[in-house]
Amino acid sequence: MLTKHEPALKDLFNRERNRFLQDPPALQLLLPQRPLILGLAGCSGSGKTTLARELTAQLSATLLPLDFYYRCLSHLPPEERAFQNFDHPDSLEHALLVQHIEELADNCSIERPIYDFTTHTRVPNRTETIAPAPVLIVEGILALHYPPLRALYDFSIYVNAPNEICLNRRIYRDLRERGRTEESVRAQFDATAKPMADLYVIPSAQHATVTVEGTDALDWSVEQVLQRLHQLGLVRPGQHTGSVDQ
């Protein structure tokens, strides 16, 4: 049985609730904050991964490289896998990447694939759990190519670098990290990496919020990005570990 005060209290509660729900700033306090999502692209060897890692440290971000989303080639004989075009947009399972970014944007964890570059396959029965974070950085040569990906970004970066610099860096990386030979890296660069960069990667620079030079000092590239984020109000003072002149 309702007491004589309960109807009035119920009406007051309903009025206050409706007022609160109609107040976007107040309502925002109740909702989980969507992460700031940055897209970072550039040709292979341009320096984009180095920049992405430094920005990840500066912004306490989660880094999501496109490299983990290469399609698994376990259905092909090993001798055929190395001849696939890994620089074409179809080589990546970009629909899964979009799904994972959307889930992280909704503050849900994901199970990210683990890719083995020596066998060109995904490691079976193994994933890495990636938890949501206030800042998410999506990095890869084609990070600015796919329209569904670009639609998720709040800010995007393109790293520009000359072909010869890119090739030399790619040789050094693939020999050290991916168990390849210099001959195979040069052959792939001429056959697919450079042609695909001309077709898909370099044109995607037009979608970038800011372009930095991969031959510049790393701290200057980081400074340019952080300054632009500040100017756009996407990063608050004190939100990163470095210093930016205001």
Describe the residue ranges of each PLM region.
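NTP-dependent small-molecule kinase module
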Residues: 2-30, 131-132, 172-175, 194-246
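Short hydrophobic/aromatic beta-strand immediately N-terminal to the Walker A/P-loop
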Residues: 38-39
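The conserved Walker
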Residues: 44
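Conserved lysine of the Walker
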Residues: 48
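Hydrophobic positions on the alpha1 helix immediately C-terminal to the Walker A/P-loop
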Residues: 51, 55
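Post-Walker A helix-loop "phosphate-sensing" segment adjacent to the P-loop in P-loop NTPases
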Residues: 57-65
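Conserved nucleotide-sensing/catalytic segment adjacent to the nucleotide-binding pocket
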Residues: 62-63, 71, 75-119
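ATP-dependent NMP and nucleoside kinases share a basic, alpha-helical "lid"
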Residues: 123-176
